């Protein structure tokens, strides 16, 4: 039996972690693209 609090923390961290990784990768891609254009 998983505690509701622990379950809520896990379900809350997963989207935040994925969003953080996506934003970091997008920023790196954008930075590389800008440097390539110049």
Curated annotation (Swiss-Prot):
Q: Where in the cell is it found?
A: Cellular thylakoid membrane
Q: How does it sit in the membrane?
A: Single-pass membrane protein
Q: GO molecular-function annotation terms? A: electron transporter, transferring electrons within cytochrome b6/f complex of photosystem II activity
Q: Which residues form a coiled coil?
A: none
Signal peptide range in chain numbering: none
Q: Which Pfam family is one of those matched by this entry?
A: PetG
* TM region(s), chain numbering: 5-25
Q: Which UniProt keywords apply?
A: Electron transport, Membrane, Photosynthesis, Thylakoid, Transmembrane, Transmembrane helix, Transport
Q: Does the keyword Membrane apply?
A: yes
Any single Gene Ontology cellular-component annotation: plasma membrane-derived thylakoid membrane
The Gene Ontology biological process terms listed for this entry are: cytochrome complex assembly; photosynthesis
Record function comment? Component of the cytochrome b6-f complex, which mediates electron transfer between photosystem II (PSII) and photosystem I (PSI), cyclic electron flow around PSI, and state transitions. PetG is required for either the stability or assembly of the cytochrome b6-f complex.
Could you give the subunit structure recorded for this chain? The 4 large subunits of the cytochrome b6-f complex are cytochrome b6, subunit IV (17 kDa polypeptide, PetD), cytochrome f and the Rieske protein, while the 4 small subunits are PetG, PetL, PetM and PetN. The complex functions as a dimer.
Which HAMAP family does the record match to this protein? Cytb6_f_PetG
Protein name according to UniProt: Cytochrome b6-f complex subunit 5
User: Source organism lineage?
Assistant: Bacteria, Bacillati, Cyanobacteriota, Cyanophyceae, Synechococcales
Gene encoding the protein: petG
